[in-house]
Amino acid sequence: RQLTSCNDYQKILRNEDTAAKYKAAEEYYENEEWRRASNLFEQISPKYRGRPQAERITFFYASSLLNIKNYLTAAYKFEEFVKAYPLSQKAEEAAYLAAFCYYKQSPVHTLTQEKTIEAIEKLQEFINFYPNSEKLSNASDLVQELRVKLEEKAFEIGKQYNKIRDYKSAIIVLNSFISDYPGTPYREDALFF
């Protein structure tokens, strides 16, 4: 039977039958109703701990969270999956998706970049652990994109010092920028300041 109405969802949410919730969660997942699926997977996940279905539930729960853009929790759940099921056929994919969730949390270059640095570290861990992965090229591209963001941030800091006429600090920051990012496309501009 197809779950369609909001009423069906509310009934299954309040239902104590774990097997019915599991079936409904998978149905919502297959129909790409990620929020409903994630809510149900969250509810049933503790009840299936240690059982054969736990692997599938954990992966689907993390995937649902990714699809509703809850990157913080999705990253945690994918990492949890890799730790719990390191030999799973889905372990490599989960490791990549965890790193990808960190990438998605990286803010624009004008903001503080702790999340960007963390994302680079997680992607690099994936690259190091799965050097033959089909996702290697994607992960490397994401690392490069994040490094460019760090370059932009560092260059903008130097420009800001110059703008407020703190030339001594501008020179220090821009010299450091040039040595930290020798191949940067901003090199000429940094030397100009």
What do the PLM-derived regions correspond to, one by one?
Residues 1-193:
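Acidic, polar-rich low-complexity tracts and alpha-helical solenoid repeat scaffolds
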